[in-house]
Design a protein with these regions (language model features):
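Alpha/beta enzyme core
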Residues: 2-202, 207-237
Length: 237
């Protein structure tokens, strides 16, 4: 049974209208000032949701300095507990980039085990799970379907770290977005075939140029990270 209806009304409405924008500060970004700046920029820029590292102090900062709803990301199920108590509206297993950089990948079995443990700990909290881009597309689709069976509420795709654009400018934006767009499209098509109504969030490698393509590929939401959080000041963000 989906817990989408337990999300704040605005988030639920944006998901259903395929127009949710999430800004990602990074799973490993525990710098309070950095998170504060990203949250303020996200609020000023019209985002609906901010995705931050799973630490209750950061949840407090996000809620204090904006009216945005908060998603927290981790791969350690027990770490979600205190952040949910602090006011996080959504929990997410994902943002694997820092692990990829260390040569650590996530198998379908590992993702499913983390998901099951998280769901057992927090059965009444909306849960999003990222499908690792390191898997072949057909395996990503299979994992997405298995995650639906585990009562996951949102499926997130990724791919930016696996794509190094050959070109600069606008063409580079398109090249970088290909992995996450391909995964989004493939999962969306299979969901349609099987009448699965779980929303898909397309994230990683997206920019203002390619976010509309994600929606065209079947996403209900988009997540942007480095396009925002690697900038140096509030106005640029």
């Amino acid at each position: 049974m989906s817990l989408i209806n337990l999300l704040p009304q605005k988030i639920e409405e944006e998901l259903r209208s395929n127009s949710l924008l999430k800004v990602i500060s990074g799973l490993n970004n525990f710098d309070a000032q950095s998170v504060k700046t990203i949250v303020e920029a996200a609020a000023l820029g019209g985002a609906d949701l901010v995705d931050i590292a799973c630490k209750p102090e950061l949840v407090d900062i996000a809620l204090k300095h904006s009216e945005l709803h908060v998603c927290v990301s981790s791969v350690v199920p027990h770490s979600f507990l205190d952040s949910v108590k602090a006011g996080a509206s959504l929990i997410e297993i994902g943002n694997y980039d820092t692990f990829y950089e260390k040569g650590i990948n996530f198998s379908d079995e590992k993702v499913l085990n983390i998901t099951k443990e998280t769901r057992d700990l927090l059965p009444n909290v909306p849960l999003s799970v990222t499908v690792p881009h390191t898997m072949p597309i057909d395996k990503q689709v299979d994992l997405a379907l298995n995650l639906v069976d585990e009562s996951v509420d949102i499926i997130q795709t990724e791919g930016g770290t696996s794509s190094s654009p050959y070109s600069s400018g606008i063409q580079g934006f398109f090249e970088k977005s290909v992995p996450t767009l391909a995964a989004t499209y493939a999962i969306s098509q299979e969901f349609k075939k099987q009448s699965v109504e779980i929303p898909i969030m397309s994230a990683s490698g997206l920019s203002q140029v390619t976010c509309p393509l994600a929606i065209s590929c079947g996403a209900s939401a988009v997540g942007v990270g480095s396009a925002v959080n690697k900038l140096d000041d509030l106005i640029s963000m």
